[in-house]
Amino acid sequence: MSNAMYNKMWHQTQEALGALLDKEPQKMIEPQRNQVFIFQTLATFYVKYVQIFRNLENVYDQFVHPQKRILIRKVLDGVMGRILELKNEMVELELTEFHYFDDILQDLKLAPQQLDIPIPKYFLKEKLEVIKGREKILAQILADSGIDTSDMKYPVKSIPFDEAVKLIQIAERARQGRLRALFMKQIYLQEYRAKQSKMLGKKVTDTWAAALRIQKVWRRFHQRKETEKLREEEMIFLGMNPPPLFNEVSATVIQAEKVDRLRNEVQIKHEEDYREALVTIKNDLKLIEGVDIKENLQDQIRHWFIECRNLTGTFPDYPDVEEGGSAIIFSDKTIQQVIEDIIANQEEEEKNKKKKKKKEKQPKKAKKQKKGTKEKNKEEDEKWKMSPSLFLPAMKEGCNAYKEIWMKKDESWNFSQDYDPELIKEEKRKELQSEIRIQVDELMRQELKNLKLAVDRERERPVKAGKKKDKKGKKGKKKEKKAKKDKDLTADRTIESLYKELVEEGLLIQALKVNLSDYIGEYSYLGTTLRQVSIEPMPSLLDVRQLITLYGIWPLGSAAVHEKAPLVKSLLLAGPSGVGKKMLVHAICTETGANLFNLSSSNIAGKYPGKNGLQMMLHAVFKVARQLQPSVVWIEDTEKTFYKKVPNAEKMNEPKRLKKHLPQILKLLKPDDRILIVGTTRRPFDAELQSFCKVYQKIILVPRPDYASRYVLWKQIIERNGGVLTSALNVSCLAKVTDGFTQGHIVEVVKGVLTDQRIRRQIHKPLTAVEFITAITSMNPVYKEEEESFKNWYAKTPLGKKRALAITGGSTEKAKDKGKRK
């Protein structure tokens, strides 16, 4: 798209955001009791903000104007934070992590795909060089230490020599047997043909009948092919089948990607020009306007001295540097306005003195209204009220800046969308004024002292420094105490050396290149409908994917969002094996460029022994994680860290080493630290629930795929592995039959069936569902009993308990009321 098209999209999005910001205070200020109405309001705002975010993210990625991008980035971070705040409000209201918006999407006439939350591309673009440099260092350390990750991708099992000889012998005998069978088949066919020729003898064939038979066979074959072709064309026309070149990359897509690359190059060039212009324009302004600004400021301050002297009879006290100096007096005000403020302040002081005298004379009122106010407060507490937002002011400020500067700005001269020098001049003029003001304040303070000595004959009163010194001394002692508590165990070591040590010990590992979009799934289309009938639906895979984006990727990717948004320090992914928990952890690191630290009990076994060693390990890990943030600390099979009873086979590994330290680590993590602790578990019921839930702030239950997700999975995984989907392959049948099997099972089966030989034979022998079904029968699915055990465990978690009480609470309260009436 062109610059004009992206500008139009931006203007439309800003208008939609402005309208939404005007509506939000009206809806949220009034307290409400109706939970359904509250959720509908929150969900509607959530869906609309997601639409705005999708458009803004696209615009920010493709805009080449550097000054517009700064404003859009500010608004974009604000929208992201607001979405997270609304999500947090919905979780607190409905007491569940999963929400369904199918009815709202229907009302707003939106497709489910429009609710998909994208990951901003600037997360990786802005630190691409840093990530590449870090990857090179990591690869170099791994190569020097003899740990090659490329060999680890395809592990090879060692086989004894005798077994290897037997395998070769079996394969050779099988090959010879196949050749022998083929030779015997050819002999049999020769003998059969000879017998047939003897039986028929020298019978003269009827050429007319032979021609008719050939025609009949040919016409049948030709008509069958023609019918198949017509049926395929009809299915393509109806949209039931994809067109023949559907999976191939079209020329339009290639051209669009090329344009994107060119826009990125222009973006970088304009950004460099803008940074250079910031320096040059400021220097030019300093030379041209610096002297005039200084003289004007001095004249204003002198005029203020004289006016204050005329009004009050004495010269004013000059504001301190800490207060802001003369900037407080003349902040967006003329000299006349400053004089009016002085008069108004004097009048207010006189009024306040009179009021104080009246209050002293009046008797104190009795405290009769306390009970009534308490009852009112209780009623207000029962009503739901939206908590104040930390991101709305930033969004409103961005919208106001857009209206003031860009809404009606004529940019016909700026076809290339380069920086606007006039805007830079306005900005730098303010900076220059504040810098010169500091120098002027020093001069004018001295001038004011001289005036006071000359006119009023006042001298400076000496400041008593004794108390201040004592206070400073006390503060110093407090700092010393804090320093003792936060003692740096590795003060004599560099971050590079600690980084190298952690890599060599296997605690800092290389994340696999997996995008979150590779986590395939489908939407839950009947979530709201099922909840209306009091049936709790199982979340779909795309619901899980959205939670990973909101709780993991967005806060780690954006520092502005992480500082103000509801803080998520730890995340637990619980689910049966094969549902993609490990893949999601690696996807978080890939999408944000985060470091991956592996603190699994199996990985830290035998490393850094003893209490001091463990303390040193955790200190080194989190010191590097803070310095090179964002960082993800992964604890695989985290239930082992919180075992109820450690199995005898695992006692030597000390799996519970981190149990006491994890809560302490979480307390030390601040909003500035973009560090996320992620735990994965396939047996959460083996852990102590109380300590488990204390450590993990957000618990996400990753389910096995439903029918819709399995249907999409089979199609995409078969195509990715070189398979061709034809009418002979009934994907719907595959999806139904494989109920209970996970993504891991499906991937394993597809890779096993689609060998190089089978892919080559697809032209003559298309794929069928039977091939995949026979391969998957040897695997164990996730049975209903296992799924129920996960549901029962989740119901015992704090959020699960609250949800259960909220569902059953209404009926119990009614029963209590009836009992009281009787």
Curated annotation (Swiss-Prot):
Q: Where ATP is bound, by residue?
A: G575, P576, S577, G578, V579, G580, K581, K582
**Claim: Protein biosynthesis is one of the keywords in the record:** no
Spans of biased composition, class Basic and acidic residues? 372-384
Please list the residue ranges that the record marks as compositionally biased, kind Basic residues.
353-371, 464-482
InterPro entries (alphabetical): ATPase_AAA_core, N-DRC_Component, P-loop_NTPase
Locate the IQ domain: which residues? 207-236
- Pfam assignment, any one: AAA
Q: Which UniProt keyword terms apply here?
A: ATP-binding, Cell projection, Cilium, Cytoplasm, Cytoskeleton, Flagellum, Nucleotide-binding
Give any Gene Ontology cellular component: motile cilium
Subcellular locations according to the entry = Cytoplasm, Cytoskeleton, Flagellum axoneme
What molecular function terms (GO) are annotated for this protein? ATP binding; ATP hydrolysis activity; microtubule severing ATPase activity
Region named Disordered: 349-384, 459-487
The UniProt function text for this chain reads: Component of the nexin-dynein regulatory complex (N-DRC), a key regulator of ciliary/flagellar motility which maintains the alignment and integrity of the distal axoneme and regulates microtubule sliding in motile axonemes.
Quaternary structure per UniProt? Component of the nexin-dynein regulatory complex (N-DRC).
Similarity-based family = Belongs to the AAA ATPase family. DRC11 subfamily.
> By what name is this protein known?
Dynein regulatory complex protein 11
Species annotation = Homo sapiens
What's the name of its gene?
A: IQCA1
